[in-house]
């Protein structure tokens, strides 16, 4: 793009023999009324516009940073018109929501603490090469526009996608390259003062091809391999951050003097600590979540009342100080004594239980419980034509495996809104979905659309990883032949820096909800007994040393192995499919026979479905999936399809239960098989009229009536002459 005031910088991403990419940052021309705006290009033909705007005054009566990130997918970016009724974009797609989360997670902690002005980042996909993914480009675009907005922001942030292809980590892989990779991850980070890169966010998974590639000799994405991928991402992140810094230097902007609201002042903290510390130390040793929370609430209310006169109109500060004292107590006990809130050690897992087949009539169900976290998994199977059709900018057009996650308010003992899923629920469902996709059977091996629903009916730490475990159990209970069982665990981290600047780190296995809130890291790892299938990392620290992260991964592997043992005791192989589940069989026909099976205006396929009660789905390659409530209906439909696509000439003497399809003055045409009719002459109908001559066919037969007939003659042209098959003949046979 060219124009007055336009400035740009470029970052070169060099993957050696596997290709080079150019990320171009532009600013100064578009969206000039936003506080900060930038256009970011990937290889010249993918373009995203990001605009960051901040409210001029802080919001009243809130105790959080009101940051909103929106990703707008414009279908014109791919040269398409939206397929909706109104032919315009509506609510954001799931892919856009997930992209929002990818941006928000590293962006939010980079703002100064205590900011209360509303900040909105809007990223619009303007042009998209279908061979690339736009989500990581969006991270860089959002960072660039925010860097230029004059906000108290400690960026810039660089975001990259890394794929493991033939033992090499490739940055910004294409869609086709990702299909050949064994592991794929999005990594975001920023450059520290010493030049090192701090990893702030990771979203990663094995690919659908991983299982086959590993069996073929490729490197499995083990914990050690994943750790090398994070290190491989750092140089690319630095290149992207350097380009953003260079562009910001060309368009300097003073940081606005935004009011920053401290959670509390020192005098309030000292008073709260004096009054609450001893009793809080006792309360934070109560293992039961609800009992502990009730005790905390009672103590906080009492402290507020006692300090109300001393600190009038500073109730919010008292609450903030109370939380800070609680955090200090919990962290000190964990770091000094190695004892957690519920009495466990750093590596201990809460009590586990697993059970399958707990809900009647559904195709598969399971209950997985870890401490007070309780997840109900329910599996549903159906025809492939029920897979989700996607009209988005995603390279995927359909989704065969659909994973939905629900977390009702009662799961935490609270009231609240129920209904359409929030961004968090969509993100958790997607994480569990990605954890299971690598072990799902192929369409050819298991021709079903699969929907998995995870109901988080009790929550106290990592319901998303509990959903992975419950889903594995439910899918096996439904008869899905998984390649391996998958389990997940959430890891935490607490750290402390001494006077000499040395930092002590302690990784925690199976964190509670409180440990997540009071800790420094949320690290979710899912996988089989052999390799990692998905992971998600968010940290509040400037960075995590490689050895600490490697240790946490190893600790997660130990926990995952223990959980898999409990799950395997409940079910370790696919059950028989439920009687209520559809039976699907596969037929392969020549491609040139597809039209005959469908028939004019769908007449033939509709007739087969009406006659058998089966549901039929035809693929472009001639694969036909036949689904029915019982095996007999499916087999009947298969026989009728084979009769059309692979016809065999009927022989004299063969009997059929046929259907009258047409009556004439000289007889009735009877359908024996799809595409095979025979003539029952009027002279052969005496048995239908007590042995008397039939004057009109309509007197004894009507269209749609079923009759037992026998082939009496096949002429040279293949036309069939029929006679009635008598009950006596049937009895003789």
Swiss-Prot record:
UniProt KW keywords: Cytoplasm, Magnesium, Metal-binding, Nucleotidyltransferase, RNA-binding, Transferase
GO BP annotations, alphabetical order: mRNA catabolic process; RNA processing
InterPro entries assigned: ExoRNase_PH_dom1, ExoRNase_PH_dom2_sf, GPSI/PNP, KH_dom, KH_dom_type_1, KH_dom_type_1_sf, NA-bd_OB-fold, PNPase
Subcellular location field: Cytoplasm
Residues involved in Mg(2+) binding: 516, 522
Record field: catalytic activity: RNA(n+1) + phosphate = RNA(n) + a ribonucleoside 5'-diphosphate
KH domain span: 582-641
MF GO annotations: 3'-5'-RNA exonuclease activity; magnesium ion binding; polyribonucleotide nucleotidyltransferase activity; RNA binding
Chief location of this protein within or outside the cell: cytoplasm
Cofactor(s) the protein requires to work: Mg(2+)
GO terms for cellular component: cytosol
Enzyme Commission code(s) on record: 2.7.7.8
Family statement drawn from the similarity comment of this UniProt entry: Belongs to the polyribonucleotide nucleotidyltransferase family.
Name of the featured protein: Polyribonucleotide nucleotidyltransferase
Source organism (scientific name): Cutibacterium acnes (strain DSM 16379 / KPA171202)
Gene name in the database record: pnp
């Amino acid at each position: 793009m060219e124009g007055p005031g336009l400035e740009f910088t470029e970052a070169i991403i060099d993957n050696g023999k596997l290709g080079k990419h150019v990320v171009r940052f532009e600013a100064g021309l578009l969206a000039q009324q936003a506080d900060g705006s930038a256009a970011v290009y990937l290889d010249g033909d993918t373009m995203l516009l990001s605009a960051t705007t901040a409210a001029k005054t802080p919001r009243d009566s809130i105790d959080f940073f009101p940051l909103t990130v929106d990703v707008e997918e414009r279908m014109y970016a791919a040269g398409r018109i939206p397929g909706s009724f109104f032919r315009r974009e509506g609510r954001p797609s799931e892919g856009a929501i997930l992209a929002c989360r990818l941006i928000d997670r590293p962006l939010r902690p980079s703002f100064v603490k205590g900011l209360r002005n509303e900040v909105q980042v809007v990223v619009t996909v303007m042009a998209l090469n279908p061979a690339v993914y736009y989500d990581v480009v969006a991270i860089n675009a959002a960072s660039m526009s925010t860097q230029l907005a004059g906000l108290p922001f400690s960026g810039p942030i660089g975001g990259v996608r890394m794929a493991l292809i033939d033992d090499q980590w490739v940055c910004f892989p294409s869609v086709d390259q990702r299909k050949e990779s064994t592991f794929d991850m999005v990594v975001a980070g920023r450059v520290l003062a010493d030049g090192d890169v701090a990893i702030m966010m990771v979203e990663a998974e094995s690919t659908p091809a991983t299982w086959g590639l590993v069996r073929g000799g490729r490197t499995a994405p083990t914990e050690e391999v994943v750790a090398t991928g994070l290190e491989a991402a750092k140089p690319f992140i630095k290149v992207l951050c350097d380009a953003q810094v260079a562009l910001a230097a060309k368009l300097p902007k003073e940081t606005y003097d935004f009011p920053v609201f401290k959670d509390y002042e020192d005098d309030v903290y000292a008073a709260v600590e004096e009054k609450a510390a001893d009793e809080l130390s006792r309360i934070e040793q109560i293992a039961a979540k609800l009992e502990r929370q009730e005790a905390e609430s009672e103590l906080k209310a009492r402290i507020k009342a006692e300090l109300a006169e001393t600190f009038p109109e500073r109730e919010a500060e008292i609450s903030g100080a109370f939380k800070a004292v609680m955090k200090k107590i919990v962290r000190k006990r964990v770091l000094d004594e190695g004892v957690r809130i519920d009495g466990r050690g750093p590596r201990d897992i809460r009590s586990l239980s697993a059970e399958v087949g707990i809900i009647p009539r559904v195709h598969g169900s399971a209950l997985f419980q870890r401490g007070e976290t309780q997840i109900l998994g329910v599996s549903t199977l159906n025809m492939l034509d029920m897979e989700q059709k996607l009209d988005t900018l995603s390279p995927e057009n359909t989704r065969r495996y659909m994973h939905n996650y629900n977390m009702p308010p009662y799961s935490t003992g609270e009231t609240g809104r129920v209904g359409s899923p929030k961004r968090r629920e969509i993100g958790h469902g997607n994480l569990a979905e990605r954890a299971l996709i690598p072990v799902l059977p192929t369409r050819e091996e298991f021709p079903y659309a699969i929907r998995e629903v995870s109901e988080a009916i009790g929550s106290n730490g990592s319901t998303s990883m509990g959903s992975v475990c419950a889903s594995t159990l439910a899918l096996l209970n439904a008869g899905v032949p998984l390649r391996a069982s998958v389990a997940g665990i959430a890891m935490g981290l607490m750290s402390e820096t001494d006077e000499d600047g040395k930092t002590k780190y302690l990784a925690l296995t199976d964190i509670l909800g409180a440990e997540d809130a009071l800790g420094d890291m949320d690290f979710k790892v899912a996988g089989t007994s052999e390799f990692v299938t998905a992971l998600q990392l968010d940290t509040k620290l400037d960075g995590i040393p490689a050895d600490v992260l490697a240790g946490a991964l190893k600790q997660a592997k130990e926990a995952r192995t223990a959980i898999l043992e409990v799950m395997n005791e409940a079910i370790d192989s696919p059950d028989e499919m439920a009687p209520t589940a559809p039976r699907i069989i596969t037929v392969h026909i020549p491609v040139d026979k597809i039209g005959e099976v469908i028939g004019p205006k769908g007449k033939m396929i509709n007739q087969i479905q009406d006659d058998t009660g089966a549901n039929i789905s035809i693929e472009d390659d001639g694969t036909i999936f036949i689904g029915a409530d019982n095996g007999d209906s499916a087999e009947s439909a298969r026989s009728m399809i084979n009769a059309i696509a692979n016809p065999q000439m009927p022989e004299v003497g063969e009997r059929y239960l046929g259907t009258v399809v047409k009556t004439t003055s000289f007889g009735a045409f009877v359908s024996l098989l799809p595409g095979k009719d025979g003539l029952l002459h009027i002279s052969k109908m005496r048995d239908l009229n007590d042995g008397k001559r039939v004057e009109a066919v309509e007197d004894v037969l009507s269209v749609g009536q079923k009759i037992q007939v026998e082939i009496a003659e096949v002429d040279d042209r293949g036309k069939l002459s029929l006679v009635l098959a008598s009950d006596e003949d049937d009895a003789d046979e």
